Amino acid sequence: MIEVFLFGIVLGIIPITLAGLFVTAYLQYRRGDRLDV
């Protein structure tokens, strides 16, 4: 049961982490683009 629980946690954390990195990179890109313009 512990392995299944940890596996579920990992499957839940990975998409959230990827989404967070994507949003952060997008905001930095927009911010840099605004500064250039």
From Swiss-Prot:
GO biological process, alphabetically ordered: cytochrome complex assembly; photosynthesis
Cross-referenced SUPFAM superfamilies: PetG subunit of the cytochrome b6f complex (SSF103446)
Localization of this protein: Plastid membrane
Primary gene name: petG
CC annotations in GO: cytochrome b6f complex; plastid membrane; thylakoid membrane
Domain of life: Eukaryota
One GO molecular-function entry: electron transporter, transferring electrons within cytochrome b6/f complex of photosystem II activity
Signal peptide per UniProt: none
Task of the protein: Component of the cytochrome b6-f complex, which mediates electron transfer between photosystem II (PSII) and photosystem I (PSI), cyclic electron flow around PSI, and state transitions. PetG is required for either the stability or assembly of the cytochrome b6-f complex.
Entry keyword set: Electron transport, Membrane, Photosynthesis, Plastid, Transmembrane, Transmembrane helix, Transport
Protein's membrane topology: Single-pass membrane protein
Subunit architecture: The 4 large subunits of the cytochrome b6-f complex are cytochrome b6, subunit IV (17 kDa polypeptide, PetD), cytochrome f and the Rieske protein, while the 4 small subunits are PetG, PetL, PetM and PetN. The complex functions as a dimer.
Membrane-spanning ranges: 5-25
Entry's family note: Belongs to the PetG family.
Name recorded for this polypeptide: Cytochrome b6-f complex subunit 5
Pfam families hit by this protein: PetG
Location (main, coarse): plastid
